[in-house]
Structure formats: structure tokens, C-alpha cells
Amino acid sequence: MGTKVSDDLVSTVRSVVGSDYSDMDIIRALHMANHDPTAAINIIFDTPSFAKPDVATPTPSGSNGGKRVDSGLKGCTFGDSGSVGANHRVEEENESVNGGGEESVSGNEWWFVGCSELAGLSTCKGRKLKSGDELVFTFPHSKGLKPETTPGKRGFGRGRPALRGASDIVRFSTKDSGEIGRIPNEWARCLLPLVRDKKIRIEGSCKSAPEALSIMDTILLSVSVYINSSMFQKHSATSFKTASNTAEESMFHPLPNLFRLLGLIPFKKAEFTPEDFYSKKRPLSSKDGSAIPTSLLQLNKVKNMNQDANGDENEQCISDGDLDNIVGVGDSSGLKEMETPHTLLCELRPYQKQALHWMTQLEKGNCTDEAATMLHPCWEAYCLADKRELVVYLNSFTGDATIHFPSTLQMARGGILADAMGLGKTVMTISLLLAHSWKAASTGFLCPNYEGDKVISSSVDDLTSPPVKATKFLGFDKRLLEQKSVLQNGGNLIVCPMTLLGQWKTEIEMHAKPGSLSVYVHYGQSRPKDAKLLSQSDVVITTYGVLTSEFSQENSADHEGIYAVRWFRIVLDEAHTIKNSKSQISLAAAALVADRRWCLTGTPIQNNLEDLYSLLRFLRIEPWGTWAWWNKLVQKPFEEGDERGLKLVQSILKPIMLRRTKSSTDREGRPILVLPPADARVIYCELSESERDFYDALFKRSKVKFDQFVEQGKVLHNYASILELLLRLRQCCDHPFLVMSRGDTAEYSDLNKLSKRFLSGKSSGLEREGKDVPSEAFVQEVVEELRKGEQGECPICLEALEDAVLTPCAHRLCRECLLASWRNSTSGLCPVCRNTVSKQELITAPTESRFQVDVEKNWVESSKITALLEELEGLRSSGSKSILFSQWTAFLDLLQIPLSRNNFSFVRLDGTLSQQQREKVLKEFSEDGSILVLLMSLKAGGVGINLTAASNAFVMDPWWNPAVEEQAVMRIHRIGQTKEVKIRRFIVKGTVEERMEAVQARKQRMISGALTDQEVRSARIEELKMLFT
């Protein structure tokens, strides 16, 4: 047996002979030619025994004898007789990419882009070409791109996939001699997608060729390229990407690369281009930013140690220290201060005046007149070779092309105010609303619609030679120059979590001079959809739930409600809410139209560097709002431990983000904010004898199950089950009644059945009807929220769910709201996904587990509750208010019993309350001196609420991530707090709670070292073993 033919040799021969010959034909020819590719090509073309394909031969007008498709070119332009297949019916698989000739582009024009010389490669032998001969270029049809599999030798074995590259070959021929050769791959890659979309055409001729052609001879060609004006129409796709499996190739844009091949040089170059980052020309050396500690490069791996089916419960958040190292804490001491607006009723602190100046300057950018004539830094300006001196603009990052001047008005005007919690971001934002109002700026209010409307500059005098007008497009359809404004100009839109809706309104009314800002709360089922009404108010406040409800890709053209207004300014409070770039909330925020955009968040990164991508997309920070670029240059380097990813993030954030912490100092080195001291301590409790017996029995039973998983080597495969065991142990530390309430009750069993029912339903119902089926992850998320007792908002009434039901598509709604939305009483559409739902398919959503025993009648205090009551009794005489945090609303139910029996007046705030009820609770707690205690779920207290009326915080049960606890308790230690703050955390000694502390400390130590993936998995198992020792 001879030497095996390599795939490289097969590929070389196929690049010349095309895809019409099988792999076996090529391999046989290579064996006959002693592995000489040139000789093998000659054998294939010259030997009758090989099955010859139908090569392109001279065809008279009116026939189409080739299997490849031709485009119209010089001598055979669109509609000319020489255009193969242009005016004649052919089989569908051989349909010409030209379509139907000149009439296919009727009403548009062909603009001359430029010409160039290129070196073609001959695929034939003999004298067939001379200088000056006009050429016809043949392009493969897109339907020919399907991968094929050819059998292995003698029909056995796996076979080899047919080479995709053979389908991307562009060949050239003459009318008299037939096929001559092929053009270089880099040219074919650029031309194919553009020709297939009928956006360009090329003309060519032979410039020089050998007198006697041989296989793989070089032929010098002259080509001219024309582009169709339809490519620049408003609704035409201008960005073309070639199909590819790799991230780098997926960012290949044909048009900018075609301009490069044609030798076109921009007369106004982009400020930065993709090549700057690939070639590492950007200033990203260690001296350009703070040194990146090894710990930060391990964050992604440590995060993966905590990912499980329960999502947020065991989620590892980035610590404040790591966050400050990643995004940087700006030295704001050098910032200028801006005087407090006269319409603000409070005096700003110096650091707040600095923030106001910084925000105002960032919004102004360049003045409107200057910005309208300044080219956007991501775009380049080209002058085409057309005699009409046409100017086009290309974006090297996105591949977009336009004839409309892309000014800096389209750049982001805003940023991220990332001051740590408690520094007064709300007041700073209100001062910005007053200092730079939309009505005062209305005369110069130029806000391009990012989704389609373009700003057209009357001149580009600031550009360098040649001096051409951006609006000089002779013969161009006038309709392309019209700017149709279908949106109503409006004021400020503030989007916040439902909990903060009333607080924003109260803060504005409290701090703004009466009459200076009109405020409208856009919330509830009866909210108006009239854009004129929304645009009349200076400030419109709404929630992320309303935003998601009004966002619809199918109906985006209707322009109703929030999306019918072009906002002067949009502020996202708690902006990390949109961190998941694929979520509806994130997409809804990105779709808003505004001139100025702000993100307010003390935690711009919560779990991963990817969290920043959603913020940058919302802010329109180019090119980082494009996932391909973010993933290539930031996300992947970070995940691979390359410090360039983090350094690039710092360079991106430096001009658009301001972050100070409570430890930041002013020019004199003094803290920018002086607050009363905070005394934080841990109270360790001892279980009573009966509690210890109960806990030990539960622990032994749980450990037996865990040891079985260890013995089977399936610890990580059963991670969710193990967390369930730990959950019961943690609840037992609070009170044994909690375990009895959950245990194996019918309600808990119903949740498991509910999950199985949803997941098994994929093969029936919705799927058979071709409807959208909820993903397993989404179903598990819904079930877990029910398991935790989280209520959520009804997407119809936008209030807390009442008598909640679940649809087969896993959406939760109020029963009454859903049934009222149907036209008949038996079935209707799900208002979220529009799937058909019958009344019989509705499932009553189980509520938080309640207790199998009469807890009032059989009440017994746990050790932890006894310790809490002792602390509260010590504070009763002082009249200071306290907040009790717990993860479980069932434990809040239990806490109400001893509080009532000991005559402590209290109110309660958790996820089951409506917006009006929340506001009422917070107002009563702040203003009623007799109410000393607020019961609050940890999640409800972790979002933006100002709780400075209290000076004591008690965390009843530890969270997996201490940062979550910290965010909640710091709601009382912030601006407005005048008393010394007391923070107490309760831990039961000798239990899983105490070991959780040790695990967290161990994680922080591990982050400082470089771990392999195997070490991460091993560490994850070791942590679980620690919890069960």
C-alpha cells in the first residue's frame, strides 16, 4: 500500500479543480502523480477516465449550461446578453445570484467605488487568454454551502467532510474560451456575501497573462467594483458577516475589507480601530493602570465553584475590595465642584458637587453645533472614485455603512455613577435633573434615534481634504435624506425596582423646589399609553416590570407608552438589575431611545465581568455594546486569566464611570463622608438540649445521604440535592418548626411534581402546536422562587401576585387578572408569550410552606430567638428602632409570635406586598415612634431602600455570600443616619452556620492563588465535606 495522501494535498488540488470531483478521484490522481499536486491536476483535467464535471464553456445567450452561477459584469452587466442565467429560467439550485437583471435594482444607482489589480490563478492549460480580454466572474450559490460527507476508501470508514472552502471559490472566464482560473480567497471572501445580496457588481479584464497557460500560473487581472445605492437605505442591512465557527472570524465584515483590498484610504480615519486592539497598540501596559492582582484573574473560576441549580442562593459575588480593584476607585479629589442648583432645597456636600460637575460635563460633551460636524471616532470617511464625489462612512467594528454623517451626537452622553451605597446617588441625580433640565436645552435638543434615524450634517468642514459635502449625493432618492421623527420628545425617565418607586417620588418632592419638577409615576394597570401625556412631565418614574411589560419586539413599531417617547435623559437606578444581557429586562432597557443615559449602581459588577457588558450596551459605548468585540477582547481574556482583559476594562471605564467609597478622601486627606460609628458583632448561640437532639438527628440523616454521594463519586452531580440538605440544617438553627414546615410536606412535594410536570410537558402540548416551550433553566428558576416564597409582580396588573396561578409556559399571574384578560371563560392567550392556555391547564401556585403544627398553641422559643429578645429588651427603653433580617418569610411568621407576646410593635416588609403596601409600611416605620421593629426579608431589604430611621440591624441567619448581608444592613448606615449603628449577626455554635463562616474564609484565601480547573472542582468538594463534618 502506498503512502497515505494528506488532507493538505487533497485541499490544494480541490482549490483548483473545484467541488465537482470526489475525494476518491483526487486521491487516485495524487497516487498516479506520485503526490505531485500540479501533475495530479493535469491528470484530472486530461484523463478521460475521470468523471468530468460540466465546466463553464462558451455558452450562447439564452443558455445556462454550467452548474455554477454567474454575476453580471463588464460585457455582461445586469440584463446584458452575456450574463449567464440573467434572463433565462434555470433550475432552482442553479439560480443566478444576479436575480433578474437590471430591474432587480430599479430605482437605485450603481456608484463606482474603485479599481485594483489582483493576481488570479489559472486552472487550465493552453493558450486561452490575452491582454485586454473581458472577463466573466462566476460565484457559487449560497445553497451550495451545505457540508457534504464523502465516503472513505472503498466505501468504508468514517469518511471525510467535504471541504467548505471549495464552495467559496470565485472563478473567472471569457466568452470565447470558457473557464480560465480563480481569484484569490481574500477577494472571494469579501465579494461573495455582497454579490449574493445584490449590493455590488464587478467588472474585469486581463492585464497580462503567460502566452501558454499552465495549471496554477499567475494571471494579472484588473477589476472595477460598483456598489448599489440601495445598500445605504435606512431599512437595508448594511452589515454583512460571513458564516464561521470561530469568534474571530464571525467578526469579519466584507465591506471594510473590500475597501482595503481596493486600496481606498479614508480621508478621515477612525480614532481607534479593531487593529489597534489586535496588534496591542492600545496603551494597556501595566503603567497605564493599577496592577492586576492574581486574585482577580481567579474570580471566574471561583465563581464556578458556586454555580448550581439554585442560582442566586449560592452565588459568589465579587467582594467590594475586588470590585474596587477591577473598576478602580477614582481619585476625585482633583475634580471641580459645581454650585448647588438654586432649585435644590438641600446643600450638596463637596464630593456631591464634584459628581454634579462631572455628570454635567459628561452630558454636554461637545456643544451641539460642534458635535453635529465632528465624526464619530468609530467611523471612517471615504471618498468613492465615482465622478460625483460621493462620500460614504464605514464602521470598522460593526461593518455598518452609511451615507449619512455619523456625528458625535450619536455617542454616549452619560455614564455610570458607581459610588458606594450610602453616599447619596439619588440626591446627586436630582441635582443633575435641576441643573441641566430638558426644557432649558430644548432649543438645542438634537437626539438621533439610535434605532434608525440618522443625523445629517450640512457640512464636514472639520474634516480634512478633500473638501466634500456630506449631503452631496446627486441622483440619490430624496426620501433617504428625510428624517422622519415618529417619537415624541420627552423629559427624564427614571427606571427603578418596584420597592423604590415611592421613595424616588418622595425624594424629588422633598429636595426639589415646588414647581421646578413635575413628577408622574407610570405604574399600574390603568397607566396611560399616550406619548403626549408622558412627555408633558419633567420626570416620569417607572419600574423594570413596567419596562419589560411594554417592551415587545413584535410590536416595537407601534411606539406606545414609554417606547413612544424620545427621552432627554434616562436614569437606571440599581442598574445591575439588567446585568443578564439575554434577559427581557436588559433587552427592554437597551431598546429605549434617549439622548443622555445614566446607570446608578454601587455594584456595577456583581458576579462576573460580563455584567458590565449590559451596562455598556445600554449606554451606547461603542464598540463595547457589540457582544462579539466584548467577548473577543475582554470576556475571553478575563476567563483565560489574561490580565489584558481587565486592563482594557479599566481603560473603558475610566472616562465614563465615577466611583467613590466611604473611605475615599478629599484634597485634605479627610474622609469625604463622616458617619456615626457602626458596631458590628457576631452573637454566638448555644442550642438547648432538645434543639441539639433535633439538630443532631437531622444532621446524621443528611450526612448519610451526603456520604452516599461521596462514595458514588457523584457529589457535583447531586449539588442541588446537597444544598437542599444544607438548607434544612440551616433552618433548624433558626427554629425546628421551620424544618417541620418544609420536610416532606404535601406542599413541597407539589413543587417537585410541578417541576416534573413542566419539564415532561415539553414533548406534548406546546411543542406539538409549534409554540415556544419554556427552557428547563427557566422552569427551575420559577419553581425555586416559589420554593423560597418569592412573590413577584403580576405582568398584567403589575402588583404583587394574588391567588397566583402558573401557565403551561411557566408564567405566573393573578388568577383574576388572567381570566379577565380572556375573551371566553375556558381558554385564552398567555399575556406574556401569547401561547394558548386552557383553564384546566392552570396550576395554583403553592405559597410559602406553613407549619404542620399549631405554632401559636405549641410555641417554644429557640435559642436564637431568645438571644434576639434579650437584645431587643435592652433597646426598648432608648426607643431606638430595629430591623430584623431573615432569608425565609416563614421565619418572619414565627418571629411575629414572640414579638406580639412581648408587646413589641412591629411592621413587616417582604416580597408579598404591593407597591402601595410597601410605601405604607416604610412610612409607618419611619414616622410612628411606637413602632420599634421592622421584619424584613433579606432580598426585599437589599435594594435601594433608605432605612435610616433604624439604628439597629439584626441578621438572623447567615447568607452564603456575606456581601448580600452587607448590602442590606448598610441601608441604615448611610447619609441621614445620626445615631450610632449597631449590627448583630446570630450564629449557632457547633452547627453548619459556624462552618459556613470557615468556608467563606477559605474561599477568600483560595482566590489569592492560581488554581487549575481540577483544583477548583476538588476545592468545591472539600468545602461540602467541611460542612458535613
From Swiss-Prot:
A zinc finger (RING-type) spans 794-834. Pfam families: Helicase_C, HIRAN, SNF2-rel_dom, UBA_RAD5A, zf-C3HC4_3. It is an enzyme of class 3 (hydrolase). SUPFAM superfamilies: P-loop containing nucleoside triphosphate hydrolases (SSF52540), RING/U-box (SSF57850). Residues 864-1029 form the Helicase C-terminal domain. Its main location: nucleus. Keywords: ATP-binding, Chromatin regulator, DNA damage, DNA recombination, DNA repair, Helicase, Hydrolase, Metal-binding, Nucleotide-binding, Nucleus, Zinc, Zinc-finger. Residues 406-622 form the Helicase ATP-binding domain. InterPro entries: Helicase_ATP-bd (IPR014001), Helicase_C-like (IPR001650), HIRAN (IPR014905), P-loop_NTPase (IPR027417), SNF2-like_sf (IPR038718), SNF2/RAD54-like_C (IPR049730), SNF2_N (IPR000330), SNF2_RAD54_helicase_TF (IPR050628). One of its GO terms (molecular function) is hydrolase activity, acting on acid anhydrides, in phosphorus-containing anhydrides. One of its GO terms (cellular component) is nucleus. Residues 83-104 are annotated as: Disordered. GO terms for biological process: chromatin organization; DNA-mediated transformation; double-strand break repair via homologous recombination; double-strand break repair via synthesis-dependent strand annealing; interstrand cross-link repair. Its EC number is 3.6.4.-. Belongs to the SNF2/RAD54 helicase family. RAD16 subfamily. This is DNA repair protein RAD5A.
